[in-house]
């Protein structure tokens, strides 16, 4: 009888813990974020391993023999630290993005069965070699006027062949099937010209719809980067340039809603105004100034926005449910906590499969804007009710969740930190579940998730006085490193068993240490 009761309690716990975990939160990391200066620098180990359900590393390229190749000199090193995040969160899935901003190689790759077979075999070997769980195919415009019209059907054929090959490989090796996903455009013109929507969805695990970059400095008028809805204030051609139309268009043409992941940008786009008119649709002379860290005109990361917003005029585009700000000749369209909340409610109402962030490295890692660490991504985590990164053993097992009927009395349903144990938390869901974070993680009350401990001040506070912003190895302890931010000194420990390498500015396994010092 006791065993039966224990099993019933265990099943209840599992069912309670699964509440709110049906949505995906997919976070892209770009391999050029490592080159940004100061607070803009972002490495794989900066990613809280339990904030997102899936992480995507961008990008790998296709060479002239139709095989995958790395893009950056240290990609192979970064792959290790990226995939090592799964050791802190066994539920996490990692994927590799293929393609990107210059996907010309796709043209010849899809052109023949032989080329497609070479590509497919290369993908399988590459993904298995580096320890990813899947890949994300990014081809923004297969229907471009520069491309042959056959590419529309060839993309579907490639998807069909990929699905078959991945199923066969999994069956032969006994390994979990490699996840096959893609990121496709939100433009009606590109969808019509390049995609057999009613066919291609059946072959992929999910599709990220890039619901951003609807407007930017390429326009001669101001417009929001990622509006939720259309507005009568915009030009007629812009009626299609919003999240709601794009997502419904994919769905209404045959893509299942549950396979559709909606894009949320962590950046804004700027314009230089032509006149004193600063309204939506006002004449624009070009891009706004470059960001201090991202360095590209017309484009600011979220952590670059706050200085501008301090004394800017902020207005809400009521029909589109998104804010914009103006100061002098600069017009900025961006997203904030409120617009994310509105968009997530719309996402839930339409029963889409989840959200993806482009990109986590453009979010505010260092709480520069005083809203917490990675505030936009954390907001999505909370709104989608994702609780990743927990130890979910059977009740009664070592390090597993325990039941304490009294702790949640008079508390609302939700997740609470354990005031007596930083690595534990309570899940109040009709019953009380007392859980552990994965090893080396602590519970963060802000994101309601398990994450890395906060950076600690170093006792030698003058260590960074003469040093530029960046990461530095502790010469006396290989598993520690310093972080210099505006001449302030912080230090952190690498995860257990790892050491810090100057070459990649990352924590990694102590292999070939002398080569990377």
Language-model features and meaning:
Residues 28, 98, 215-236, 264-346, ...:
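Glycan-binding loop/region signatures in secreted carbohydrate-active enzymes
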Residues 55, 96, 137, 162, ...:
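Conserved, mostly hydrophobic/aromatic
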Residues 35-49, 113-128, 188-199, 243, ...:
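Short, acidic/polar
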Residues 123-150, 213:
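Active-site groove signature of glycoside hydrolases
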Residues 3-22:
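Cleavable N-terminal signal peptides of Sec/SRP-targeted secreted and luminal proteins
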Residues 19-127, 152-153, 161, 371-396:
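Glycan-recognition patch characteristic of GH18 chitinases/ENGases
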Residues 65-76, 142-307:
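Substrate-binding surface in catalytic domains of secreted glycosidases
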Residues 389, 397-517:
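Cysteine-rich, disulfide-bonded extracellular modules and peptides in secreted proteins
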């Amino acid at each position: 009888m006791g065993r039966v009761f224990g099993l019933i309690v265990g099943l209840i716990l599992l069912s309670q813990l699964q509440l709110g975990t049906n949505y995906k939160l997919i976070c892209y990391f770009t391999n050029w974020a490592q080159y940004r200066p100061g607070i803009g620098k972002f490495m794989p180990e900066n990613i809280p391993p339990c904030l997102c359900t899936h992480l995507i590393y961008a990008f790998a390229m296709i060479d002239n023999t139709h095989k995958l190749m790395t893009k950056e000199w240290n990609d192979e090193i970064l792959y290790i630290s990226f995939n090592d995040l799964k050791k802190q969160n066994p539920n996490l899935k990692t994927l590799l993005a293929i393609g990107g901003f210059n996907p010309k190689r796709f043209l010849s790759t899809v052109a023949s069965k032989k080329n497609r077979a070479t590509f497919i075999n290369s993908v399988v070997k590459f993904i298995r070699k580096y320890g990813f769980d899947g890949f994300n195919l990014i081809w923004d415009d297969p229907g471009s006027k520069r491309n042959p019209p056959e590419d529309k059907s060839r993309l579907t054929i490639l998807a069909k062949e990929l699905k078959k090959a991945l199923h066969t490989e999994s069956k032969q090796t006994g390994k979990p099937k490699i996840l096959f996903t893609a990121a496709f455009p939100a433009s009606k013109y590109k969808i019509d010209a390049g995609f057999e929507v009613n066919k291609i969805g059946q072959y992929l695990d999910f599709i990220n719809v890039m619901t951003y970059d609807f407007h930017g400095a390429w326009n001669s008028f101001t417009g929001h980067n990622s509006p939720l809805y259309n507005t009568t204030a915009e030009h007629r051609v812009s009626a299609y340039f919003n999240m709601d139309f794009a997502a419904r268009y994919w769905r209404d043409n045959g893509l299942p809603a549950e396979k559709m992941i909606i894009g949320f940008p962590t950046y804004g786009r700027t314009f230089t105004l032509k006149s004193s008119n600063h309204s939506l649709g006002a004449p624009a002379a070009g891009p706004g100034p470059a960001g201090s860290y991202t360095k590209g005109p017309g484009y600011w990361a979220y952590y670059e926005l706050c200085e501008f917003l301090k004394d800017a005029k902020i207005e809400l585009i009521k029909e589109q449910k998104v804010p914009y700000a103006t100061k002098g000749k600069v017009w900025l369209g961006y997203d904030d906590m409120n617009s994310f909340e509105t968009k997530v409610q719309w996402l839930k109402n339409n029963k889409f499969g989840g959200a993806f962030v482009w990109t986590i490295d453009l979010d505010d890692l260092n709480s520069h804007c005083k809203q917490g660490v990675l505030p936009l991504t954390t907001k999505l985590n909370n709104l989608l009710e994702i609780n990743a990164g927990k130890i979910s053993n059977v009740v009664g097992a070592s390090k597993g969740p325990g039941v304490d009927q009294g702790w949640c009395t008079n508390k609302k349903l939700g997740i609470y930190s354990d005031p007596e144990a930083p690595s534990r938390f309570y899940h109040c869901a009709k019953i009380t579940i007392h859980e552990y974070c994965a090893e080396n993680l602590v519970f963060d009350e802000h994101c309601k998730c398990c994450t890395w401990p906060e950076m600690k001040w170093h006792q030698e506070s003058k260590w960074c006085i003469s040093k530029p912003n960046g990461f530095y190895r502790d010469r006396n302890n290989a598993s520690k490193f310093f972080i210099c931010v505006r001449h302030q000194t912080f230090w952190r420990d690498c995860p257990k068993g790892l050491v810090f390498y100057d070459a990649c500015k990352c924590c990694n396994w102590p292999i070939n240490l002398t080569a990377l010092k």
